[in-house]
């Protein structure tokens, strides 16, 4: 009898717990965004110690991928898999049609990363504040991009966070992309891995050591909470493997984790919206 009453009491308490709402699983907190003057997201949840690793690429068809390509994707995927970390990938639509990238793109999806794009043809949207691509031309380019994403089984609700081509756009271009149903992000200001294409004869040239030093200086001075950290998944010519930032991805992940950072993707952002 005591056992029976105990069962009733326990069941009753559980029922009251659920009815009171205490047993409900907490809904994800709506993301907080830090935007630049153009209105593009540059950091996500700056109060949380997470980093958003993003990887972009384009395939230059005029030189069969000599200068721009997606050849870094497999080493990036292998490192992320080894470290148990997820990333967000934004190749241009042109990358999706190259035979050599079919399997890596499928891996991006199958291994749980976020996949979107970077326009189809890597359009230069603006220059010196002037819009260079009309809304109609942009819509045609994005329609081609969407065909490729959906060829891999994705729906727009899964890939609507997008990086503008060349990580550059003005307010008009942003509004045109938003009218097509997209939300925009760009790499956070500070890190300089996007200069990995430069060579020693260029004024903007930075060595890989300088790029890494800049990242750790930024972490120590400002912190990297919510940072969108861009690394090109490309093999630029006239570069040795040690000079390619993605070949230092494992070191970057290890150091960030040792300093208490976690990693998130734009899948997490969509889930919380």
Language-model features: locations:
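C-terminal motif of bacterial Sec signal peptides marking the signal peptidase cleavage site
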Residues: 19-21
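Bacterial N-terminal signal peptides that target proteins for export
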Residues: 1-11
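Active-site beta->alpha N-cap acidic-glycine motif
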Residues: 27-114, 121-127, 144-159, 252-255
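Catalytic domains of cell-wall/extracellular-matrix polysaccharide-remodeling enzymes
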Residues: 97-103, 122-230, 234-262, 268-271
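Short, conserved catalytic or interaction motifs in soluble domains
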Residues: 24
